[in-house]
Protein backbone atom coordinates (compact mmCIF):
# COMPACT_ATOMS: atom_id res chain seq x y z
CA UNK A 1 0.00 0.00 0.00
CA UNK A 2 1.39 3.41 -0.87
CA UNK A 3 2.17 5.80 1.95
CA UNK A 4 -0.28 8.42 0.69
CA UNK A 5 -3.14 5.92 1.24
CA UNK A 6 -2.08 5.14 4.79
CA UNK A 7 -3.42 6.82 7.89
CA UNK A 8 -0.76 9.00 9.51
CA UNK A 9 -0.91 7.03 12.78
CA UNK A 10 0.29 3.87 11.04
CA UNK A 11 3.54 4.90 9.39
CA UNK A 12 5.96 5.18 12.32
CA UNK A 13 5.67 1.70 13.83
CA UNK A 14 5.95 -1.70 12.11
CA UNK A 15 3.18 -3.27 14.23
CA UNK A 16 0.78 -0.43 13.49
CA UNK A 17 1.74 -0.51 9.81
CA UNK A 18 1.04 -4.25 9.57
CA UNK A 19 -2.26 -3.82 11.42
CA UNK A 20 -3.25 -0.90 9.19
CA UNK A 21 -2.40 -2.68 5.95
CA UNK A 22 -3.97 -6.05 6.78
CA UNK A 23 -6.76 -5.47 9.32
CA UNK A 24 -7.80 -1.81 9.64
CA UNK A 25 -11.21 -1.34 7.97
CA UNK A 26 -11.29 -4.96 6.79
CA UNK A 27 -14.70 -6.42 7.67
CA UNK A 28 -14.70 -9.68 9.59
CA UNK A 29 -17.44 -12.09 10.51
CA UNK A 30 -15.08 -14.47 12.30
CA UNK A 31 -16.16 -14.90 15.93
CA UNK A 32 -12.65 -15.66 17.16
CA UNK A 33 -11.19 -12.56 15.52
CA UNK A 34 -14.02 -10.34 16.79
CA UNK A 35 -13.58 -11.79 20.28
CA UNK A 36 -9.86 -11.07 20.08
CA UNK A 37 -10.51 -7.46 19.03
CA UNK A 38 -13.04 -7.02 21.83
CA UNK A 39 -10.51 -8.14 24.40
CA UNK A 40 -7.54 -6.29 22.95
CA UNK A 41 -9.61 -3.10 22.89
CA UNK A 42 -10.53 -3.76 26.52
CA UNK A 43 -6.86 -4.25 27.37
CA UNK A 44 -6.07 -1.00 25.58
CA UNK A 45 -8.41 1.09 27.76
CA UNK A 46 -6.30 3.87 29.24
CA UNK A 47 -3.26 2.79 27.23
CA UNK A 48 -2.10 3.05 23.63
CA UNK A 49 -3.13 0.75 20.80
CA UNK A 50 0.54 0.61 19.81
CA UNK A 51 1.41 -0.95 23.19
CA UNK A 52 -1.30 -3.59 22.79
CA UNK A 53 -0.21 -4.41 19.23
CA UNK A 54 3.34 -4.91 20.51
CA UNK A 55 1.99 -7.33 23.14
CA UNK A 56 -0.55 -8.99 20.86
CA UNK A 57 1.42 -12.19 20.31
CA UNK A 58 1.74 -12.63 24.09
CA UNK A 59 -2.01 -12.10 24.45
CA UNK A 60 -2.69 -14.68 21.75
CA UNK A 61 -0.41 -17.20 23.45
CA UNK A 62 -1.84 -16.54 26.92
CA UNK A 63 -5.46 -16.84 25.77
CA UNK A 64 -5.32 -19.80 23.36
CA UNK A 65 -5.41 -17.49 20.33
CA UNK A 66 -8.69 -16.20 21.75
CA UNK A 67 -10.52 -19.51 21.45
CA UNK A 68 -13.79 -18.50 23.08
CA UNK A 69 -14.60 -21.89 24.59
CA UNK A 70 -11.12 -22.32 26.07
CA UNK A 71 -11.13 -18.80 27.49
CA UNK A 72 -14.51 -19.46 29.12
CA UNK A 73 -12.96 -22.40 31.00
CA UNK A 74 -10.01 -20.48 32.46
CA UNK A 75 -9.80 -20.95 36.22
CA UNK A 76 -8.95 -18.26 38.74
CA UNK A 77 -5.54 -19.90 39.23
CA UNK A 78 -4.87 -19.90 35.48
CA UNK A 79 -5.87 -16.25 35.25
CA UNK A 80 -3.54 -15.40 38.15
CA UNK A 81 -0.70 -17.22 36.38
CA UNK A 82 -1.38 -15.28 33.18
CA UNK A 83 -1.18 -11.99 35.10
CA UNK A 84 2.11 -13.01 36.70
CA UNK A 85 3.86 -14.76 33.82
CA UNK A 86 2.56 -13.57 30.46
CA UNK A 87 4.15 -10.59 28.72
CA UNK A 88 0.87 -8.68 28.71
CA UNK A 89 -0.49 -5.67 30.59
CA UNK A 90 -0.48 -6.70 34.25
CA UNK A 91 -4.04 -5.74 35.13
CA UNK A 92 -6.01 -8.42 36.97
CA UNK A 93 -9.40 -6.94 36.06
CA UNK A 94 -8.57 -6.81 32.36
CA UNK A 95 -7.24 -10.37 32.42
CA UNK A 96 -10.30 -11.64 34.29
CA UNK A 97 -12.49 -9.80 31.78
CA UNK A 98 -11.34 -12.20 29.05
CA UNK A 99 -13.08 -15.10 30.82
CA UNK A 100 -16.15 -12.97 31.59
CA UNK A 101 -16.29 -11.85 27.98
CA UNK A 102 -15.93 -15.44 26.76
CA UNK A 103 -18.85 -16.58 28.90
CA UNK A 104 -20.98 -13.68 27.68
CA UNK A 105 -19.93 -14.32 24.08
CA UNK A 106 -21.06 -17.93 24.40
CA UNK A 107 -24.49 -16.69 25.52
CA UNK A 108 -24.61 -14.32 22.55
CA UNK A 109 -23.66 -17.15 20.19
CA UNK A 110 -26.55 -19.24 21.46
CA UNK A 111 -29.03 -16.38 21.12
CA UNK A 112 -27.85 -14.94 17.79
CA UNK A 113 -26.15 -17.92 16.15
CA UNK A 114 -22.75 -16.21 16.28
CA UNK A 115 -21.00 -13.27 17.86
CA UNK A 116 -20.61 -11.84 14.35
CA UNK A 117 -24.38 -11.96 13.79
CA UNK A 118 -24.84 -10.01 17.01
CA UNK A 119 -22.21 -7.35 16.20
CA UNK A 120 -23.16 -6.95 12.54
CA UNK A 121 -26.83 -6.76 13.51
CA UNK A 122 -26.25 -3.23 14.76
CA UNK A 123 -25.59 -2.11 11.17
CA UNK A 124 -27.97 -4.49 9.37
CA UNK A 125 -24.87 -6.27 8.02
CA UNK A 126 -23.73 -3.09 6.26
CA UNK A 127 -20.30 -1.48 6.52
CA UNK A 128 -20.17 2.08 7.77
CA UNK A 129 -17.69 4.10 5.75
CA UNK A 130 -16.83 7.45 7.28
CA UNK A 131 -15.27 10.24 5.24
CA UNK A 132 -13.14 11.94 7.89
CA UNK A 133 -10.61 14.36 6.41
CA UNK A 134 -8.24 14.11 9.37
CA UNK A 135 -7.81 12.57 12.81
CA UNK A 136 -9.15 15.75 14.43
CA UNK A 137 -12.57 15.06 12.91
CA UNK A 138 -12.86 11.54 14.33
CA UNK A 139 -15.14 11.61 17.39
CA UNK A 140 -14.25 9.70 20.55
CA UNK A 141 -17.66 8.00 20.32
CA UNK A 142 -20.75 8.03 18.15
CA UNK A 143 -24.42 7.34 18.76
CA UNK A 144 -23.87 3.84 17.35
CA UNK A 145 -20.79 3.13 19.47
CA UNK A 146 -22.70 4.27 22.56
CA UNK A 147 -25.60 1.95 21.66
CA UNK A 148 -23.30 -1.04 21.10
CA UNK A 149 -21.39 -0.33 24.31
CA UNK A 150 -24.60 -0.15 26.33
CA UNK A 151 -25.86 -3.39 24.84
CA UNK A 152 -22.54 -5.16 25.40
CA UNK A 153 -22.63 -4.11 29.03
CA UNK A 154 -26.11 -5.56 29.27
CA UNK A 155 -24.77 -8.95 28.21
CA UNK A 156 -22.09 -8.73 30.90
CA UNK A 157 -19.07 -7.92 28.78
CA UNK A 158 -16.71 -6.12 31.10
CA UNK A 159 -14.26 -3.25 30.74
CA UNK A 160 -15.80 -2.06 27.50
CA UNK A 161 -16.47 1.55 26.64
CA UNK A 162 -16.89 3.34 23.33
Positions of predicted regions on the chain:
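HhH-family (HhH-GPD) DNA N-glycosylase catalytic core used in base-excision repair
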Residues: 1-162
Amino acid sequence: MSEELRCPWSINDPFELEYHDTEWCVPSKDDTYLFEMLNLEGAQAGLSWRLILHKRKAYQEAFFHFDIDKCALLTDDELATIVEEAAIVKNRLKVKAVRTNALATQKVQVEFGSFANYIWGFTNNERIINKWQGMGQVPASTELSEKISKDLKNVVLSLWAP
